[in-house]
Regions:
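N-terminal, intrinsically disordered, highly charged
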Residues: 1-154, 164-165, 173-175
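Conserved beta-strand position immediately N-terminal to the Walker
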Residues: 170
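Conserved glycine(s) of the Walker
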Residues: 179
Length: 179
């Protein structure tokens, strides 16, 4: 999978200092699962996912992406690959790799197609092993001004005239985490 999706750059965070973060990143890069971890995050971002869930069963690790509020299952990994991927992700977030039962929270960064993302990772022991939830959020909003939306001039003028009205009600909607 990691050869079929655009590459990501994983950035270690969560340690007390940059030197320890760099040490954690170097240690994680030694694992063959480092490319798998990057690949699953890249796959999620390619599908426009904002969250990624990795869930252990006895024989495999299930993978789901949250795309616009809908969970989408993708091909699972075998348990050995999934466990190694968990270790990589925990290492770059400065969490205890050996602790598979307690709830742990950490953070790491990702660069994908030139865009930087902040990621939070939560791991929790479950009956069949461990569940990892990763939330992926862009460092800065994709749209800062109405012009950034790509709205045609005529539509923008109509929208502005509605906003300028003295009475009325306008409902805005956005994907979670986007305003």
């Amino acid at each position: 999978l990691h050869e079929m999706v655009p590459p990501v750059t994983l950035l270690a965070k969560g340690a007390d200092d940059d030197q320890q973060d760099q040490g954690n990143l170097l240690a994680a890069k030694q694992s063959p699962a480092f490319l798998v971890a990057g690949g699953v995050i890249s796959h999620c971002l390619t599908k426009r996912g904002s969250r990624l869930m990795l869930d252990c069963t006895q024989a495999a690790v299930g993978v789901k992406f949250d795309v616009d509020g809908v969970w989408m299952a993708v091909d699972p990994y075998d348990r050995q690959t999934g466990d190694a991927m968990f270790a990589v992700l925990k290492k770059i977030t400065n969490l205890n790799v050996q602790d598979r039962k307690s709830r742990q929270d950490g953070k790491f960064g990702v660069t994908f197609k030139g865009v930087k993302f902040n990621c939070t990772l939560t791991s929790q022991g479950v009956k069949t092993g461990e569940r990892v939830m990763i939330t992926i959020a862009p460092k800065k909003p994709r749209f800062e001004k109405i012009l950034d939306l790509g709205m045609r001039e005529k539509v923008r003028e109509q929208f502005k005239s509605l906003i300028d009205e003295d009475k009325g009600f306008i409902l805005f909607s956005a994907a979670p985490g986007n305003g």
